[in-house]
């Protein structure tokens, strides 16, 4: 075959003509003269979509790539095999310390048969949410343990990866809600039942090969015989039926329950069937004869689930009474009652390796672990209080026992693995709920920052009448920068006599913290005279009642004076608060023994002046129509009390160190009342704005007055 000729002119140059089609072809063979296969349409569409998303506005920010959690058991299995081969001692196990580097010594549960506590799966790994928003009724691991199969209320099977827990596929298999499905022991068959009573056969690849109507009403549970030739089902028609798998034919119908049968399970090695019903009975059946062997009447409510232990000696039942009951089939007696749930228990699962470990889920979303080897087997050893937001319907352990999967009414399937060597998972939101975890985190931060487990109550100042602050001086969040500023200001004497000053508006720390106050009728302002805040801090008492509100005339008459100072309250440690506002101005006084008249600004108050018998002071002469005052039962203040020297008469002008002035009831209208300044000592009744109350441990001496001078000494 000759090469094609190219037209040329007389000089041999090629004539202009159409372009060479090979010149526009960008493809050239690179190896063995075989062209590369072009991308298919799906790849091109994905590339175009990604380019469009990148060019779109508002998506220029960098996306944070989060790696998916993966639980790989191959490392632990290989480590265990290596130890058995190299050490030559089958029971040799390396010690595991609370250090992240010791995770390499984490062996599978089969290598730690003598320690069931290592197989508690309470560490959250992943939450898988089905594309179809429907409750997850059943969860089961596939026989090869590489995937997890879930069934929901819409009749769909969903496959999840068993290592990375990502979604793989979804298949519509039933027309109604899937209530139960289980794999055969050899892993070659799958039988499922739905709410309509339909039973279907599937291959391991989820291919439907047969289906028939098994019960007239909903079918709730399915269980295989030990040799995989038969399986048993139960339903709301009150019957327990035994079926031949190969013939898809009913062999025997067991009747004896008086209501819906909610659960059934075949013994793992023997010809024995257990069933639980809504009639509160647990029955044991002989599958060969169909007779009722025994009936247990321990439960007082509906039986929701029943499961044989892997060794076949125990059977666990649970229901609406929120407890799990263990029975020994060798005696047909109740062995133990496991408590710890607050709502009805919906599912039970035994650990495949550690047969003394039991896990259960209830209608509140709680998952509890019980150990029969525990000193107190009736109480859970681990509780996941907030494992799900709604009821837990199904639980399933990985065949190796290192992962637990739970299905719930909140449309999710959650995966839990064993705790890692550092620990700390017991303080997360799954164990303590959101509020408990936040409180625990706050305590941890508080302990790290201030060296204490929690912020002491009233650490920065005392309340009314009770003890002041704690002995330990603790900085307050957000106010620690004010300490230097407060220390640089002269704040005057404190209750501790030279102790650290308090923060503005928060009181002063009180080192004399005593017994807590008691609520009795004796007012706190009637403590030991002269003790002030210190005396009340060691045993102060709260006033029980409040005086009656003053009349409108009294309020208008006493409203002209300014209120007392607030700086003294900040230094008043544990003293009682005086009348800081107009509606509290009767708390600082005490009740008149003759009735409802109050010392202070209460209506119908006593004549002015201090009570008799204190520091040599006497009452002024009472009006003719006013009954005499009873003698005081309180001891006088100590002699030479600072700030209160005895006075020979009441004619002294007001000022520092002067006793209160007295006025008769019908005082002259001319001129304002004396000692009305906010810095002086308040009187009873007339001086509504006195700065310091003379009597009581920090109480407001005069109506809306400030805080007691005695409370600061």
From Swiss-Prot:
Compositionally biased spans, kind Gly residues: 460-470, 679-713
Biological process annotations from GO: chromosome segregation; mRNA 3'-end processing
SMART domains: WD40
Lineage, uppermost ranks: Eukaryota, Fungi, Dikarya, Basidiomycota, Agaricomycotina
Pfam families reported in the protein's UniProt record: WD40
Start-end of Low complexity biased regions: 534-548
Gene: PFS2
WD repeats: 131-170, 173-213, 214-253, 256-295, 298-337, 340-380, 387-426
PROSITE patterns recorded: WD_REPEATS_2, WD_REPEATS_REGION
Described function: Required for 3'-end cleavage and polyadenylation of pre-mRNAs. Also involved in chromosome segregation where it has a role in chromosome attachment to the mitotic spindle.
Domain of life: Eukaryota
Name of the molecule in the record: Polyadenylation factor subunit 2
């Amino acid at each position: 075959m000759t090469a094609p000729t190219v037209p040329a002119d007389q000089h041999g140059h090629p004539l202009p003509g159409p372009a060479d089609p090979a010149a526009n072809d960008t493809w050239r063979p690179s190896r063995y003269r075989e062209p590369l296969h072009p991308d298919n349409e799906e790849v091109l569409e994905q590339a175009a979509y990604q380019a469009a998303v990148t060019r779109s506005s508002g998506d220029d920010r960098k996306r944070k790539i989060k790696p998916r959690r993966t639980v790989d058991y191959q490392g632990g299995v290989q480590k265990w095999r290596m130890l058995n081969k190299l050490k030559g001692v089958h029971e040799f196990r390396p010690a595991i310390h609370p250090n992240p580097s010791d995770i390499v010594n984490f062996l599978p549960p089969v290598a730690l048969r003598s320690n069931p506590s290592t197989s508690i799966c309470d560490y959250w790994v992943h939450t898988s949410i089905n594309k179809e928003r429907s409750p997850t009724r059943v969860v089961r691991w596939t026989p090869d343990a590489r995937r997890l199969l879930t069934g929901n209320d819409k009749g769909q099977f969903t496959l999840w990866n068993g290592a990375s827990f990502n979604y793989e596929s979804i298949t519509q298999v039933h027309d109604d809600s899937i209530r139960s499905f289980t794999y055969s022991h050899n892993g070659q068959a799958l039988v499922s039942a739905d709410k309509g009573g339909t039973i279907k056969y599937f291959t391991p690849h989820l291919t439907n090969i047969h289906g028939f109507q098994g019960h007239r009403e909903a079918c709730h549970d399915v269980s295989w015989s030990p040799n995989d030739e038969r399986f048993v089902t139960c339903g709301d028609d009150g019957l327990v039926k035994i079926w031949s798998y190969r013939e898809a034919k009913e062999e025997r119908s067991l009747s004896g329950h008086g209501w819906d049968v909610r659960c059934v399970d075949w013994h793992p090695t023997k010809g024995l069937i257990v069933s639980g019903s809504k009639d509160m009975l647990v029955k044991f059946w002989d599958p060969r004869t169909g007779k009722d062997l025994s009936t247990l009447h321990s439960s007082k409510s509906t039986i929701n689930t029943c499961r044989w232990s892997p060794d076949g000696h125990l059977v666990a039942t649970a229901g609406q009474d929120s407890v799990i009951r263990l029975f020994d089939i060798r005696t047909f007696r109740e062995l133990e009652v496991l408590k710890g749930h607050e709502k009805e228990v919906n599912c039970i699962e035994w650990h495949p390796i550690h047969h003394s470990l039991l896990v259960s889920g209830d209608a509140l979303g709680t998952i509890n672990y019980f150990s029969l080897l525990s000193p107190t087997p009736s109480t859970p050893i681990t509780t996941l209080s907030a494992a799900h937001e709604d009821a837990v319907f199904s639980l399933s352990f990985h065949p190796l026992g290192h992962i637990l999967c739970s299905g719930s009414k909140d449309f999710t399937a959650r995966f839990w693995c064993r705790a890692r060597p550092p620990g700390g998972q017991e303080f997360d939101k799954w164990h303590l709920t959101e509020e408990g975890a936040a409180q625990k985190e706050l305590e941890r931060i508080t302990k790290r920052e201030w060296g204490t487990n929690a912020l002491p109550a009233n650490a920065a100042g005392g309340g009314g009448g009770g003890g002041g602050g704690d002995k330990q001086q603790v900085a307050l969040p957000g106010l620690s920068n004010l300490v230097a500023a407060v220390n640089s200001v002269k704040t005057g004497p404190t209750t501790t006599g030279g102790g650290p000053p308090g923060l503005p508006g928060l009181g002063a720390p009180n080192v004399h913290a005593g017994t807590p106050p008691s609520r009795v009728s004796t007012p706190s302002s009637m403590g030991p005279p002269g003790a002030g805040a210190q005396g009340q801090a060691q045993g102060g008492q709260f006033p029980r009642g409040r005086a009656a509100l003053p009349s409108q005339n009294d309020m208008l008459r006493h409203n002209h004076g300014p209120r007392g100072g607030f700086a003294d309250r900040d230094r008043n440690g544990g003293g009682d608060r005086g009348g800081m506002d107009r509606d509290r101005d009767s708390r600082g006084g005490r009740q008149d023994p003759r009735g409802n008249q109050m010392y202070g600004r209460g209506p119908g108050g006593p004549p002015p002046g201090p009570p008799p018998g204190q520091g040599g002071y006497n009452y002024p002469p009472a009006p003719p129509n006013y009954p005499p005052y009873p003698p005081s039962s309180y001891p006088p203040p100590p002699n030479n009390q600072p700030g209160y020297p005895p006075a020979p008469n009441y004619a002294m002008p007001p000022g520092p160190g002067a006793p209160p002035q007295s006025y008769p009831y019908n005082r002259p209208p001319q001129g304002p009342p004396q000692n009305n300044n906010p810095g002086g000592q308040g009187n009873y009744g007339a001086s509504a704005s006195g700065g310091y109350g003379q009597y009581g441990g920090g109480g407001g001496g005069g109506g809306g007055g400030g805080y007691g001078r005695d409370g600061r000494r």
